[in-house]
Amino acid sequence: MQYINIANRGVKSLSPYQAGKPIEELERELGISNIVKLASNENPFGFPESAKKAIFEQLDKLTRYPDANGFELKQTIAKKFGVQPNQITLGNGSNDLLELFAHTFATEGDEIMYSQYAFIVYPLVTKAINAIVKEIPAKNWGHDLQGFLTALSDKTKLIYIANPNNPTGNFLTSQEIEDFLAEVPENVIVVLDEAYTEFTRSEERVDSFSLLKKYSNLIISRSLSKAYGLAGLRIGYAVSNPEIADLLNRVRQPFNCNSLALTAAVAVMNDDKFVEKVAENNRIEMRRYEDFCQKNQLDYIPSKGNFITIDFKQPAAPIYDALLREGVIVRPIAGYGMPNHLRISIGLPEENDKFFTALSKVLKFA
């Protein structure tokens, strides 16, 4: 029996998501130690002590189900951003939410729109529900918003826009986003995926929550895996108008956020100083990457995230493999249609030093 023959038609066209190679896997494969992983845009600075304390206090309660509605976390988010708890949907990471949006608002025959070189989860969820992929060609590695507007049709139900974008790091300004929203029909849902927004400077950051008051078709999606350092716990949240949130929570699986994640999320979201320190350290180390690339005449895409994408002007797979042998894991992105590029997460200073040394050896820089 070939079970693919009875699978959902959309599933047949999918390939499994390829995450960044784990350190333990490389240790097994090559028998090397002191490996540096700069592949998954994780927070190298960890998470604050307040979150660790909150997790330990929760351990004795793990025989009980978590709060299915995430009351305390919703209250924390609402207070922090000036929204109402009934506007919030919680997810098992923002990936969970990105899939939830598609299941709630699109079905077979509907169009879901996103940019070329956008987060690979967008096409995955689109194909999984048999919706129509509407990939808009990129403009300077980023979103061509006019291209989105031109491509709109009566079948368009959902638009995903990551800002900053992953894996390219491009960034749209508040004005660009508002001008775009003003042209999108009210019956088309726009998802603003802000997983990396905390790495932008406060003065340039999009005030997306204020846009909710004007555009009822907007959903803001955020993650606590990046700047907040909770990637292993899987927790994210979406903010929208209450009617949309109600629909999302009808589809959302019960108990989709575990007790430890909910508890740690409350702690980290109350620790602004920690996140500010993480963002500032990221900017310092990002400048080192930019200086390294400029010194060695490597083209890169300017990034507002916690990663940088380098164009090697040749197939990057051999460079990736050579870096693995040097004990450095980065991210090949041929699956994004960028076979000449590698994406490198910004790490601790000593981790970045190891990358600079390894790449210099691989490319034989003087």
Swiss-Prot record:
Pathway: Amino-acid biosynthesis; L-histidine biosynthesis; L-histidine from 5-phospho-alpha-D-ribose 1-diphosphate: step 7/9. Its cofactor is pyridoxal 5'-phosphate. It comes from the Bacteria. PROSITE patterns: AA_TRANSFER_CLASS_1. Gene3D superfamilies: Aspartate Aminotransferase, domain 1, Type I PLP-dependent aspartate aminotransferase-like (Major domain). InterPro entries: Aminotransferase_I/II_large (IPR004839), HisP_aminotrans (IPR005861), HistidinolP_aminotransfase (IPR050106), NHTrfase_class1_PyrdxlP-BS (IPR004838), PyrdxlP-dep_Trfase (IPR015424), PyrdxlP-dep_Trfase_major (IPR015421), PyrdxlP-dep_Trfase_small (IPR015422). Its EC number is 2.6.1.9. It catalyses: L-histidinol phosphate + 2-oxoglutarate = 3-(imidazol-4-yl)-2-oxopropyl phosphate + L-glutamate. Belongs to the class-II pyridoxal-phosphate-dependent aminotransferase family. Histidinol-phosphate aminotransferase subfamily. This is Histidinol-phosphate aminotransferase 2. It comes from Haemophilus influenzae (strain ATCC 51907 / DSM 11121 / KW20 / Rd). The lineage of its organism: Bacteria, Pseudomonadati, Pseudomonadota, Gammaproteobacteria, Pasteurellales.
